Amino acid sequence: MHFTGRTWRPPYEAHSVIIQATSGCTYRKCRFCNLYNHECFRMSPMEEFEEDLAEIKTYQPNARRIFWTGANPFAMSYENLRLRAWTVRDYLIKCQTMAMFSSIRDIKNKEVWQLRKLRAAGINGLSIGTESGDDQTLLLANKGYNSDDIVEQCRKLDEAGIEYYFVYMTGLAGKGNGYRNAVNSARLFSQLNPYFISVDSLTLFPD
């Protein structure tokens, strides 16, 4: 298996088979995150991807769910995502769904019809690090989008039938702003249909 850089998956994907689709992050500007500061975004070459699929087929031929690693594999183009999804299904005929991390920014360049095609190919389970639904907090964290963007892009996922999950981060709004952040985030998330919302806490480390 080819794994480079930081490789991790959310706890709820513990039973999914993992494969590297990308490494690094396309953005690397979130103020609270240093996971990928020194790691440029890279797509795994198809040759590597297929070699890993062949290895998975040998040891876990009945795999039903595959988690693509990397900070945001959904940043890949529609064509690349679709090619890889169908390649997975060529190797793993019992695979039902493929999941991965995504940013709101990654959904913007995809039309609803493209999202439907990706869903038909088996992509169904986007972990989206929204962190907040409060505009002031999103700006402070330098997320690169606002609450309206979250609603607009996730409604596209709803229309396409793609399941998605939110991450909410406590402590991100700064001292004295937690209540405002929580209320505004709850109002925003209630307009959408995340399958679930996981909660993380901001932890500060010295540089």
Predicted regions and their residues:
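Canonical Radical SAM [4Fe-4S] cluster-binding loop centered on the CxxxCxxC motif
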Residues: 4-48
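Conserved, mostly hydrophobic/aromatic
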Residues: 25, 33, 49, 68, ...
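Conserved functional loop/turn residues at catalytic and ligand-binding sites
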Residues: 29, 34, 122, 161, ...
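Active-site mouth loops of central-metabolism enzymes
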Residues: 43-46, 101-108, 173-180
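Short microdomains enriched in Cys/His and/or Lys/Arg
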Residues: 45-62
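Short, acidic/polar
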Residues: 49-50, 109-117, 180-187
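Conserved SAM/AdoMet-binding glycine-rich loop
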Residues: 57-159
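Conserved C-terminal portion of the radical SAM core fold
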Residues: 125, 148-207
